Amino acid sequence: MNANIRLLKYIVGVSSALFLIFSLISLFETIQNEKLYERDICFDSQCLKFFAEKTSGIVMYFQAFGWLITTFVTVFGVMIALMTYNAGVKNNNNSNYTSHLTMFREFASAELTKRSSIYPEKVNFFRWYRVMFPEAQGGDISVSRDYLEIISRIKCVIEEANAHITEENKDYKYKTHQRKMMAVLDEIGISISNGPKNIFIEVESQILDYIDTINLSFCHSSSVIELSRVKRKYI
């Protein structure tokens, strides 16, 4: 900001100096051409009026220059004010972003310790946060549509497995289900490995509950799905 003020002073100073030089040259030529130097020096009203008439062009230049400088300084001042405001907003957004991200990370980390089947190194909090709040650095902490769609796809993976369960047939192709669940969870930074059916179901149960806990705390949207309430016929 100091650099902008220095630039303003420099422009005004240089412009004023150039205009002063131009005015002095114009005044000198006017005196020469009108032979004003041959007249006696006097300061009565008639003399001053006569001199003003002869140098009226220079006076108009001064008036125009004054108007231009005033306009320029006003416009430049408004620009500096806007830049100051934008810088303040940006700094405030950065501060809010950092605070919100820290709160998210600390809360998610604390909740993760309550779930023994999920390994901490398998959860990327920063990726999860970026998917959930892609515009957070700009001050917008609204939950993204992409994130809500991912949550919806997790539900679809569960329902697809449910569709294979019947009274006669309990086989839901659990390996295919595991691959699909792993793929969709990876989109929000949660990485899990495939494994025996019962162990995977336990891990999946804790993850769904974990996601719900985060969503209930940070997603103020009526459209978010509570995954742990989705019936899973295969458990």
From Swiss-Prot:
Membrane component of antiviral defense system Retron Ec48, composed of a non-coding RNA (ncRNA), a reverse transcriptase (RT) and this membrane protein. Expression of this retron confers protection against bacteriophages lambda, T2, T4, T5 and T7. At multiplicity of infection (MOI) of 0.02 cultures grow normally when infected with lambda without collapsing, at MOI 2 cultures enter growth stasis. At MOI 3 cell membranes are permeabilized within 15 minutes of infection but do not lyse, suggesting the phage are not able to finish a replication cycle. Keywords: Antiviral defense, Cell inner membrane, Cell membrane, Membrane, Transmembrane, Transmembrane helix. This is Retron Ec48 transmembrane protein. The N-terminal transmembrane region is required for protection against bacteriophage infection. The keyword Cell membrane applies. GO terms for biological process: defense response to virus. It is found in: Cell inner membrane. GO terms for cellular component: plasma membrane. The chain crosses the membrane at residues 11-31, 64-84. It is a multi-pass membrane protein.
